[in-house]
Amino acid sequence: MASIAAERIDRLHTLARAAARTGDDDRAREYVRLARRLAERNRLTLPPAFRRFTCDDCDAVLVPGRNARVRTRSGHVVVTCDCGTHARYPYTG
């Protein structure tokens, strides 16, 4: 059962990115919400790429330069959504 849910989460992530590329942000948000709910109900963790490129507050698919600002600081990357939510990710280099 979990593998079916994981496949569906991957498919919803692909659909959300495609919808965001075409400018259909509402549909992309709905796909993100469905994937998060599916992961929650099946006790699955979301893939790292999914977590990194979606906003935790407004469920938007983050596209750098369009609805997200990306800044590098010493030791971490700061991604800011249009809604104002910040996410920090460590990096080495």
Swiss-Prot record:
Q: Which UniProt keywords apply?
A: Cytoplasm, Endonuclease, Hydrolase, Metal-binding, Nuclease, tRNA processing, Zinc
What does the record note on quaternary structure?
Consists of a catalytic RNA component and at least 4-5 protein subunits.
Instruction: Name the protein family.
Output: Belongs to the eukaryotic/archaeal RNase P protein component 4 family.
Print the organism lineage.
Archaea, Methanobacteriati, Methanobacteriota, Stenosarchaea group, Halobacteria
**GO CC field:** cytoplasm; ribonuclease P complex
Look up the record and name the cofactor or cofactors this protein needs. Zn(2+)
From the Swiss-Prot or TrEMBL record, give the protein name: Ribonuclease P protein component 4
| Gene designation per UniProt | rnp4
Where does this protein chiefly localize? Answer: cytoplasm
Q: Where does Zn(2+) bind?
A: 55, 58, 81, 83
What does the entry comment about cofactor binding?
A: Binds 1 zinc ion per subunit.
